[in-house]
Amino acid sequence: MNKGNLIKNYAVALLNNAMVDNIQDKIFEEITSINRIITDNFDIREFLFSPIVNKNDKINAVNSLAKNIKISTIVQNFLLLLVKNSRTAILSNIVDAYNTLLYESKNIKIVQVISANKLQPKEQEWIKSRIEKELNQTTEILFDIDNTIIGGIIIKYDSMLQDYSIKGSLEKIKKALKIVNIAV
């Protein structure tokens, strides 16, 4: 099984368990919080991701962590499953996949908008309304900054990429000039 399918399968299983008790958002908050703790703490991350550390020690650590921060049984059991199957290293990917599935279950599309500079709230609202009108769907927009695009924006969702950046336009011109054998 490829890694993408594996990640999605874990995310689907977690979401399905959360749906039984209608606590999908709570589970997302918990799993995101746990992921942040692991990501931000080098020692915890190395301990849980290390193939050398005994699984029983990892299980004890997860149980202790769950007790200290009071997470749900669903999340605790999910983390224990990841430990038992040696899959803790893909937790961040699973959290991202869970988030995507959660929004899909609410019929909300996640869209990433990349700009060269921080956009003002009015600009963000305008972009959001234009994207929602184009997609005819409610969206959750993730605004990111990448100053290498020089100006404009790049819009990403699903497998779509709409490049309205200056860098993208320059790349297209460069490619067109190469096709007609003009040195760039």
Swiss-Prot record:
Keyword Cell membrane appears in the UniProt entry: yes
Molecular functions per Gene Ontology: proton-transporting ATP synthase activity, rotational mechanism
Subcellular location: Cell inner membrane
Pfam family, one: OSCP
Membrane topology: Peripheral membrane protein
Chief place of localization: membrane
Complex and partners: F-type ATPases have 2 components, F(1) - the catalytic core - and F(0) - the membrane proton channel. F(1) has five subunits: alpha(3), beta(3), gamma(1), delta(1), epsilon(1). F(0) has three main subunits: a(1), b(2) and c(10-14). The alpha and beta chains form an alternating ring which encloses part of the gamma chain. F(1) is attached to F(0) by a central stalk formed by the gamma and epsilon chains, while a peripheral stalk is formed by the delta and b chains.
Family named by the database record: Belongs to the ATPase delta chain family.
Described purpose of this protein according to its UniProt entry: F(1)F(0) ATP synthase produces ATP from ADP in the presence of a proton or sodium gradient. F-type ATPases consist of two structural domains, F(1) containing the extramembraneous catalytic core and F(0) containing the membrane proton channel, linked together by a central stalk and a peripheral stalk. During catalysis, ATP synthesis in the catalytic domain of F(1) is coupled via a rotary mechanism of the central stalk subunits to proton translocation.
The protein's name in its UniProt record: ATP synthase subunit delta
Lineage: Bacteria, Pseudomonadati, Pseudomonadota, Alphaproteobacteria, Rickettsiales
